[in-house]
């Protein structure tokens, strides 16, 4: 029997996406799922628990998410990190318009981009955020 040996594959790193918009999730998953396992939560209130459970290498926050917006969620993650209750996270925010960059900066996001999500820009932004 002439079987080709299979090489072991490295486990994929996890990216957490927080959005209540299906189209935003689909765009992010399509752009990143080749290199990462994409896990979704629908509200900002779910992010902290998901970070603890899934230990993502990157968190992608939609500025406009459910009960706790992306800015508040980003600030909450930064406070938890400073209190050493969670490991440091790289955070990319998805904004609605260029003017929202001020909010992303104030929320201490590592990077941001304006929706609609361009797959190439998101992959580049993700790579840069992870290597910073």
Residues covered by each model-derived region:
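The C-terminal output helix
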Residues: 127-132
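Conserved acidic segment of CheY-like receiver
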Residues: 11-23, 27-29, 59
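Two-component signal transduction core modules
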Residues: 59, 112-113
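Alpha4 helix (beta4-alpha4-beta5 surface) of REC/receiver domains from two-component response regulators
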Residues: 72, 93-111
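Conserved phosphotransfer microenvironments
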Residues: 61-79
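Acidic, metal-coordinating helix/loop segments flanking the phosphotransfer/catalytic sites
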Residues: 42-58
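C-terminal output helix
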Residues: 117-126
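His-Asp phosphorelay/catalytic-motif detector in bacterial-type signaling
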Residues: 57, 82-90
């Amino acid at each position: 029997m002439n079987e080709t040996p299979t090489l072991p594959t490295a486990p994929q790193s996890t990216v957490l996406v927080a959005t209540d918009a299906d189209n935003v999730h689909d765009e992010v998953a399509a752009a990143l799922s080749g290199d990462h396992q994409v896990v979704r939560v629908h509200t900002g209130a779910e992010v902290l628990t998901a970070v603890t459970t899934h230990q993502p290498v990157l968190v992608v926050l939609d500025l406009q998410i459910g009960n706790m917006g992306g800015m508040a969620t980003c600030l909450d993650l930064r406070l938890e990190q400073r209190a050493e209750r969670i490991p440091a996270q790289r955070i990319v925010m998805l904004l609605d318009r260029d003017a929202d960059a001020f909010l992303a900066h104030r929320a201490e996001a590592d990077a941001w981009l304006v929706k609609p999500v361009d797959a190439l820009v998101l992959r580049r932004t993700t790579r840069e955020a992870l290597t910073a």
